[in-house]
Amino acid sequence: MKSVYDFIVRPIGERYANTKKIGDTDLVLNTKIENWKFVNRFAEVVSTPLAVATPVRTGDIVVLHQNVFRRFYNMKGKQVNSRSYFKDDLYFASVEQVYLYKRNKYWESLNDRCFVMPIKNTDTLATQKEVSNVGILKIGNSFLKELEITPGDLVTFKAGSEWEFNIDDERLYCMKSNDILLKHGYKENQAEYNPRWAKGSR
């Protein structure tokens, strides 16, 4: 079973990541289907597209766009699946909706996506805990590598370009290569900002 242009994937776990384990208790974090931040982004690849060359293989773990597994309310107020739904627990995902795939225990980006971790705000008078639009590149891609922008570099990115993901207990911002505006180089005195709630959740 293969799609011509899309991946066929199944979610790892539930469609929504609404709970977090606190000791022996499952804490419910969200009860609304509208909140995209709690949609599960992790999937297993069931099949790869026939007409698109991709490094992703059947069985790989991938990170997806938040709308693949999401549910919506239609005009009549009824819950419906996203247009990505195929059947049972299977979904279509276009190449543009697959951001990362895991290979040899490491995450590799697909196409022009990259992931940046925000840095701590050291200004004692500031109310924000992280510096706006500045972060450390954690997962790069081939486009950025050609520009000599590599993981570990401190970068400035466009305001509003960041989409929040939780990858391996780290809160990262997903964006495109052209959202990276400036490379500062590696800065040893800059500390990553990863809130405690990001650990142990997706």
Regions found by a protein language model. Give the residues of each.
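Acidic-enriched and Gly/Ser
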Residues: 1-202
